[in-house]
Amino acid sequence: MIWNEILCLGDSITFGARDCYGRSYPAELGKMLTEKTNEFYYCHNHGISGETSSDLLKRSWNNISSKSNSNIMLLMIGTNDTQKNIPEHIYEDNLRQIISIAYVHNMYVVVGTL
């Protein structure tokens, strides 16, 4: 069986804080991909509740470097930026920098939003 790793970065939505069944979207995604293919998928959940894009940027290099076997990064961040009135240009710059770090590590990047 082939082993695939996906790195999921984000805030409480990624972490799964509001799921009444204690499941996160990374766990469910890994399960669904494994069931639909002949390959095993593991999604590393690096979601932290309350985190902004600035917080995520500060830890991105270590998170991305430590998951060098992952070739896909899913990024969902921004809810807390909105709630904390972080200017849009700062949010956009943070996303660009996070994505650039992933590109340095030869990752495909998927940016999600709500």
Question: For each of these PLM feature ranges, what is it?
Answer:
Residues 31, 39, 55-114:
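Alpha-helical cap/lid subdomain in secreted, periplasmic
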Residues 1-49, 54, 59-69:
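Serine-esterase "nucleophile elbow" of acetyl-processing enzymes
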